[in-house]
Every structure is written in structure tokens, then in C-alpha cells.
Amino acid sequence: MKTYEDLEGDGGSNIIGQVVQLGEKLRSRLDKIKHKVALMSGKGGVGKSSITANIASCLADRGYKVGILDADLNGPSIGHLLGVGNELKLETKNEGIEPGNGHQGIKIMSMDMLLKSADTPVMWTEEANATAVWVSTMESTAIRELLADTNWGELDYLLIDMPPGSDRIDNIRSLIPELAGAVEITIPSMLSQHFVTKSITKNNKMGVPIIGLVENMATYVCPHCEKEGKLFAGEDVQKLTERKEIPYIGKIPFDTRVSQSKSGNLFYS
């Protein structure tokens, strides 16, 4: 049996050429996109995807060309929020896979659009004992392919809806060295602020610019009198941003009308 050292060349696979070609393909896509911004949260359930969709909508309203990459591979929701579900039949052309066109012409690529049905889970392997390293490698490869194979065209902004936590920013930064920065999203609960602080610290150590922090569900809007009240007890989020020396972008109230809206119409006017 031959060992790895006994092999001559690459066996005809031209693996180096393939890697170079993949890198050039990704680079050609990204070069047509002016600004790439990651939307992050320390934990789930803070409304990150809804805010991503609303930011994209606001940018589109101002005449910018916008795309969203749903990087939350195991819990994709951007397609649903913007009216593009898994019923969309993706079309492959010479230029690549055509992204879904959501609300206001926002270009979308999401794992949700690649699944057979709405209740189909993302399964990276049939092996029950698959290691975390193996799954993480497959996730990283999937992100690269979604970025490189999608025909984004020329965009002013590509928003990247990240999964909860701070560990996946490593993959995004390696794929997009020119990442403009990250927008952190939190709710004013002590637990959420605990995790978003970790995310901020991680980005600072990695040199990822923090564009600012959005405080979601800052208050509760009464559906009857429209008065606002506090929902959570925690540190004042503005003080948190001052302590971490990052911009405070603003706060958004918890509004039940958003949850009552239909898919593709979850936007503030």
C-alpha cells in the first residue's frame, strides 16, 4: 500500500488548479459588490433576521441595489420574511444561480430555497456521530458556494444574516477580507447583553469593524393606547455601547403588528 509520501503529483485531479479557480470565481463575484455587512447577535431570538430584512428594505427604498445572503444555514428565515420561500425554482444560467427576488427586488440566497419542502431540515450528514469539526467544514464550504455560485450582479450592499453567536464570523472574514463591518443586535435583557458583549469582544480581537449596535424590543407598544413600556430588566443598552466604545444606532419597540403581518410585508414605514 502506498503512503501519502509515495504519491507523485496530485493523481491528475489538479486540486491546486481547482482551488485557485474557486478563489477567482468568488473574487469576481465580490468585486462587483461595494459594501459587505454582517448582521450579528450574541444569541438567538432577538429579531436579527427581521432587522436585516428591514435594513435591506430601507436601503432599497433609497435606490440602492441590495442582496442578502442568509448565512444562518440551519435556521434560514430571510426567504420567508421577504416573500421568497422554498417553492421558488432556482434557475441556473451561464452566469451562475439566479438569486430569488424578494420585496423591492432585493436579491436573496438562502438554504431555505434549496430544500424540498418547508418542513425539510438541513441535514449535513446521515451519520449520527459526525464530529463538530466535520459539520463546521461542510457549513463553511456551503457558505463559500452560496457566495461564489450566486449571480449577485452589481450590488451596492450585500447584507449577511449571520447565525446566532460569534463563532461563524471567522469563516465570513476569511471569505470576505474586505468585510465593511458588523452590526450587532441585542434586546435589553441581561442574558442577551451578556452574549452580545462576547460577540463585540470577539470582533474587536479579530479586527472586524463594528458599525454599531441596534437595540431591538426596547419597549412594548400597547395595541390599545399605543403607550410604550419596558419589557426587560437589564443594563441600559446605550451605556453598554459607551462602555464598549461602539456607536449606538438606535432602538426599536416590540410591535405586535409586525408578527401579524403576512410574509413579505414585515416592514416599518
Give the location of each predicted region.
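Residue-level signature of catalytic and energy-coupling elements of molecular machines
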Residues: 33, 44, 70, 78, ...
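Phosphate-binding/switch loop-helix module in NTP-utilizing enzymes
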Residues: 115-173
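Phosphate-binding loop that captures ATP/GTP phosphates
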Residues: 65-66, 71-121
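Short glycine/serine/threonine-rich phosphate/pyrophosphate-binding segments
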Residues: 48-54, 75-79, 162-171, 192-195
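Conserved Switch II/interswitch segment of TRAFAC-class P-loop GTPases
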Residues: 153-166, 178-199
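Walker A/P-loop phosphate-binding motif and the immediately C-terminal alpha-helix
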Residues: 35-73, 200
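Phosphate-binding P-loop
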Residues: 28-34
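C-terminal lobe/tail of nucleotide-utilizing enzymes
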Residues: 1-24, 200-269
